[in-house]
Amino acid sequence: MKKQLFSLTATILLNLSISANEISTTDFLQKDFKVTLDWLEQKPKSYAKDFFILQYLNQDNLSFENAKIAYEMGNGTNATLKKVFNDKYKKTAPIDLKCYRATIEELKDEDSKCIALGLSLKEALQLSKKDLEFFINKLDPYPTLKYDLKIIASDDIYTNLINSDIKRFSRFFFDLGSNFRIKVLNKKLPPELINKLSKEKDFERFLRYVVYDKNLNNLQKSLFILKDDKSLTSSTNFLLGINAVNNNDAKIAYNFFFNSFNKAYLRIDKDKALFWLYLVTQNNSFLQELSKSWDNNIYTLYAKELLDIKPDNLIYTVDLKNTKSSFDIYDAFKWMEVVEDTKKNLDDTKLQKYYDIFTDEDTLPHLTFVLERYNKYKTQYYITPFRNIIKNYDVYKQVMIYSIARQESHFIPSSISFSSAQGVMQIMPFLSLDISKKLNENYNIYEQFIPNKNIQYGSFHLDTLMKQFDNNPLFIAYAYNGGAGYTRSQLKKGLFKEKGKFEPFLSMEMISFNETREYGKKVLANYYIYNNYLNSENKISLSTIFESLVSPY
């Protein structure tokens, strides 16, 4: 009887957390739901399906055959799914494992295949010339590795490397680590080598390694010769412009930013290049041009603030029919159908269809998503859904939740990312599990699709980040996306410390991980807009926000 009462209570509590007046019929929110192969087979390939395949693979006592069937239903590009499957079900051949784990002395007794498997370039760099010669003499069947070792064994690694082929140079550059790059490659590279590198598919990756390492200043200056290269992408030109700014050459930076603007397709990329053209020239015509942009990002909002122009395309409320919607807001696959359907041919007739589907407060985020697409993002919605939950927090916390949730999920409860982040606040499963333990709550991964639960956990996580980063919205955003440890490591490089000519904008561009860098800017723009809407008695300027971006480390 007690067990039945507990089960009934748990079911009631789950339903209460969903909605005061609604009991969800979503299958995976039902008690004792378990992913099966039959259930998976009915679902289309998507990030959502990959998430549920992961839940299936994590079940106990699963046969290899069934695990393989489920794995092969996936997208094929999901790194998390691949890792889980390989770690749990795919075994390395014993002979290969032996070679991977072998010490240098043990490898000396092995054949050429085992040496090729077990000896990395990084390990080879630490070997004596005698040991290098020993391995070189055993590697005739593996000429690429043999020649790599010959270069490492030479008296002039740099000269031999730059006179080798471009693939080998790239392999050494990426595989041998930061110390090797600083000690051996921090030189003014020959123009012909730079030009060859610029044609490689890994060139932007190469640039990130160079530009974000202040110890590679000589190599950085080698890149100036690309200022007139018309084949480079907008993003490559922009990064080269930042590199020129870091090396105190505003004239060359101007060339790169100008090329970046002309090559850019996305409005945000055009605005970013325009803003930096303004910074390196102080020419107000670039601000004027920025102020005409329809996108509300930190660059355009700041330009409008400096020119005393009020944004005219921010929408905070939307009229609804206020009838109960039949749309299942928890079903990721239903939402995926909407996303696909609105990608093209979104005309008045189709828009009216969604006005008739998304009719209540629960589906307000879904409607504004469609409206933004319909308006080609030239009208931007800063709605405040889930007020019954979020209004209970202080204003700063409300602003942070809305700023992050808008960027993370557009407030869609059923959102699932490629990395399996869930819900309105896009919380990773490992994090939600950890939070449940700290809150001493029973854990059900599917409850993260319920806004009440997901926002509660997101708020808990924000509390820890707010303490670590002094309530600074930009640093909190970096940590929410890239992790607190990564954010601290970036700040400890000296970012957001100086009060230089281009700060804090230069520090904002020196965050090494692209997703985190751009995420922070978007959340900061959201923060500015939401603060001045929800906290209208204490409005804040972007200038003031920028002045507050000072590292606590």
PLM segments and residue spans:
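Generic helix N-cap/helix-start motif at coil->alpha-helix transitions
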Residues: 28-34, 44-50, 59-66, 74-83, ...
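Helix-turn-helix repeat elements of alpha-solenoid scaffolds
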Residues: 173-185, 210-220, 245-255
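Export/targeting segments at the very N-terminus of extracytoplasmic proteins
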Residues: 252, 354-411
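Short, functionally critical alpha-helical segments immediately adjacent to catalytic or ligand/cofactor-binding
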Residues: 387, 392-415, 427, 455-460, ...
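Substrate-binding/active-site groove segments that recognize
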Residues: 400-401, 418-441, 454-463, 485-486, ...
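Catalytic and substrate-binding regions of cell-wall glycan-acting enzymes that process beta-1,4-linked
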Residues: 476-536
